[in-house]
């Protein structure tokens, strides 16, 4: 085996492109396998893009469903380089918690080499391809028992690896509300996914437990000197916000 491509079972090879302010969507099929194979030979890792419901955090009306400052503290307590308060709030305010595809990227434009940002070279665990011929540049996947974050810990050990960002999308159906997409049943619009749905609530709770369990190890790896201070800060934020 030369290459290994990760593809989550709640992701589909299409891009959702928003048409203007009305929110009608153009769906564009994506050739994920071919696109990764095109670039992986000259890389250690290739990583694509996600659109749709890119995190298991449901939509909430800030200061109506929940106090914004408390929600901000919660997100900060579980955040990493990929999930941050700024990115979550922007999606809520701009597009009801949905990430839409960039048309140029969906058309295969814009490949580039992704560089280490100081604490790692950040990737996520799907639309992720590994070059097994460069096994010395591929760190292990690991997460604490019952936790999330195996792609996060993988990322912090990619500092000396060559990562190519490839212009191809997966649609992430994080709440399994659009499984018809695999049969090319494409909705004209995407709806807000709220926590009032019991299945959505349980998905969010499970994800939250996983984030809380992995955060101490992430803090230790990325900032040992301030570990005790940051763990205490996180604990206080969780105590106030949960």
What are these regions (language model features)?
Residues 176, 182-242:
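Terminal low-complexity segments of carbohydrate-biosynthetic enzymes
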Residues 14-53:
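Conserved donor-nucleotide/metal-binding helix-loop-beta segment in metal-dependent transferases, i.e.
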Residues 156-172:
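Catalytic donor-sugar/metal-binding loop of nucleotide-sugar-dependent glycosyltransferases
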